[in-house]
Amino acid sequence: VELSAIVIGDRVENLCQESFAYGAAKVYLMDAPVFHHYRTQPYYEAVCYLVNKYKPEIVLVGATGLGRDLAGAVATELKTGLTADCTGLAIDDKRFLLQTRPAFGGNIMATILTERTRPQMSTVRPHVMLIPNKDTSRQGQIIRESIPLKEEDIAVKVLEVIDDHRSGADAIDIAAAEVIVSGGRGMLSKENFHI
């Protein structure tokens, strides 16, 4: 199975080499100012254009807030299935993507197949797949594409961006935490947390 990546954004061509370093053979690049900030409409139009043109068997999207938004819009437009929050993926001998995800409140695991439509689409939770060793010497093919989309064609306008990302000593990565303790305003103060 050949691995390809889609890179969409504004001045993001440098990310193509990163994709090659982690195993992509091809990168489909859409690089334009209209993609500067994530908005559903331009991104899903770009992905749908690429899927309709190149006909991939499988499309995987990270199960992040933005990834879930994008994958849902793309699957709806393409009239294909989408398995959300997969915790396991495999390809069987008939080239079906075996998409495993928790069901019924996490009490059982369900394996889902998309038999009749293409592409087979999944959003994938973090840490489901092993990260391959980075090989900066790997090269691949960049396929530049564009769609005739102007800023005035997009219904949602970005008026202001407020950066809420902390860096340095203030940064907290809860995705890597083994235990997270949380409480609401009813706790009144941190002193009321007794573990």
Where are these regions (language model features)?
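N-terminal glycine-rich FAD/FM-binding segment characteristic of electron-transfer flavoproteins
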Residues: 1-195
